[in-house]
Amino acid sequence: MVSERYAALMESTAEDMIAEAVRAGRCRLDDLALHYAVAVTAEVVGLTSSPVPAMSRRLTRFFRQPPFDLARPRLGRTKRQLMGAAYNGLSPVLRFYLADVLPAVRDHRRRPRNDVISQLLDQGAGRADILVECVTYGTAGMVTTREFISMACWHLLEDDPLRARYLAAGQDERLGILHEIIRLEPVVGHLYRRVRDHITVSDEGREHHLAPGDLVDIDVRGANADPASVGTAPLELCPGRTLPRGIGASGLSFGDGAHRCPGRSLALLETDALLTRLLAQEPTILAEPSLGWDELFAGYRLRGSELRLGSA
């Protein structure tokens, strides 16, 4: 169980970071969320041989990509854009490998631990396989969790009754509130998949035939706001809403089936561990966040929210 295995790690990391923010009297929310998500996930994975702030900066560079269109040849990019994408994609991976992954692998060979890297080494995985896993955890497990923490905190700070309910609730109810927030505000707005076999899907009585190689755009935000799936008032935040059988509380925000995000429980639990401690400090908003859009994972980006903590 994630809650049992990593609870102490999430709680101690959150307490340390909130204590540091309280001493400073203020914090920038997206930076706090990033460093916290990176610190927790790094421990889970085993990327513990480099400083968290430096690794955080390297991970955010993964997302510096020119626009693209999956339905067009060469992603709709010019030759110059393709060259820029290759450089922007490969150079951060190389830096991440040399500064974070390789030192961690060396340390784990000398001293195995109970984490992902040690498990991969036990299975005979090579450095390339370990790098792929670390990049996957680094982008999905760290950077996207940063966005959800920021969005969930913003919702709770803007809604006094919801914040009071959250702080007074037990963990199950708090997680229910977070499920509803991420249903309404999925971090990844679209999932793109290539069809592997001939399939037929129906939509409102109409059949659509899909052939191998066809590109399917799964509109996560739209699906999560479908009254047929999530009930009445789909665009309102209603924790504990009654859902049909087979529909999860977070909708498609963590995917589904074979591609369902394996880190969904960790993401929600670490968000809860940080927000309960942050909101207990009764933060005051000094600067509202700016809302942007990230084409790479078709999701929102919140930056610049400043919070005052304590009496500072």
Question: What residue ranges belong to the model's regions?
Answer:
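Cytochrome P450
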Residues: 1-312
